[in-house]
């Protein structure tokens, strides 16, 4: 599977709420849709953290497990767990080959974590990854900026992914949506 050509993950913090959405499509190679309802967004750490992945499915399961272990080790400190995961991911010979990216968030913090060691916190409370990430990011920013008073974080996350799914062939309309309150 080519890296990141199988999904879109979008996350937003808005009006004191945090929401993350992901599509359900799993693509094998460049031409075959293998699954329509994969769950790429999950609640972790007793429902206090959301995590979403783009990339190889097997790699993502490994990273979810590692990230949850880091959350436990650092008592739910999202930034510390993310930095430690990125350090281990970048420095380990086997893990370095994993083809995935993660978005993680709690009520206060939103982060992008990658295998090259980046842990990035956006300025505007919005992140998107995957093949449809740029479409979702653009839609989400427009929605938050121009309709934010009338929409919840959950509404923005759902609409941004729906728009990305209408444009990106690797993103479908089987949206998984999680929210932290």
From Swiss-Prot:
Any Pfam family hit: Proteasome
Q: Where are the transmembrane segments?
A: none
Location in the cell reads:
Cytoplasm
The molecular function terms in GO held by this entry are:
metal ion binding; serine-type peptidase activity; threonine-type endopeptidase activity
A GO cellular component entry from the record: proteasome core complex
Q: What is its EC number?
A: 3.4.21.-
List, from the UniProt record, the residues annotated as the active site of this protein.
2
Q: Which residues bind Na(+)?
A: 165, 168, 171
Main enzyme class: hydrolase
Q: Which GO terms describe its biological process?
A: proteolysis involved in protein catabolic process
Q: What does this protein do?
A: Protease subunit of a proteasome-like degradation complex.
Query: Sorted alphabetically, which HAMAP family does this protein's record hold?
Result: HslV
Q: What is this protein called?
A: ATP-dependent protease subunit ClpQ
Source organism (scientific name): Bacillus velezensis (strain DSM 23117 / BGSC 10A6 / LMG 26770 / FZB42) (Bacillus amyloliquefaciens subsp. plantarum)
